Amino acid sequence: RGLVGSEMCIRDSMKIVFATGNPHKLKEIQEIAGDGDIEFVLPAKGFNPVEDGETFEENSLIKAREAAKLSGNYSLADDSGLCVDALNGAPGIHSARYADTAQARIDKLLNALDDCENRSAKFVCAMTLVDGEGNLIYQTRGECRGEISRKQSGTNGFGYDPVFLVEKNRTMAEMSEDEKNLVSHRGKALRDVIKFIKSELM
């Protein structure tokens, strides 16, 4: 079996399962991907991976393989998180489970930093592409450095975006989608994956 099955490559286009249950992530991925050569779709019903890896890379591989197992299709997964220097890299791989709700996670983070002067942090995104049998094809990482603000600001984006300062005292949540996608950890990782797909699989 070749890298690209006939059912996968039709008129220079390709369908890839994006292993997430988060519609915000899928929307962001589709916007970054742009031109339509690659169509990203949600995983099949029953997608519920056990993310018990110890790194972003391990968890993204777990998710990609679970999606491929259900679909038999090329699958791409990301595992992302916020790593805060003063918290020894926390919340890290536990970013999505740091507290019960998005607002609670932000509140917990701001309380943990309190009056801390060192507010340096980075968003990390590990992306993993597997084939329909779950074999690892490509893995990459994107990072975006910034600082944690003292209060949340902005209504765009999701997750920790309202407290992540990127440039000119603007949080990610104050940026337009296009601006965010240019600098974000997920944008950097996905552009690298797409470059690989178009050069090696299409």
Q: Where are the predicted features?
A:
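Conserved CoA-thioester-binding segment of acyl-CoA-metabolizing enzymes
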Residues: 1, 18
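Short, small-residue-biased leader/transition segments that mark boundaries at the very start
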Residues: 2-10
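Anionic-ligand binding patches
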Residues: 15-17, 24-202
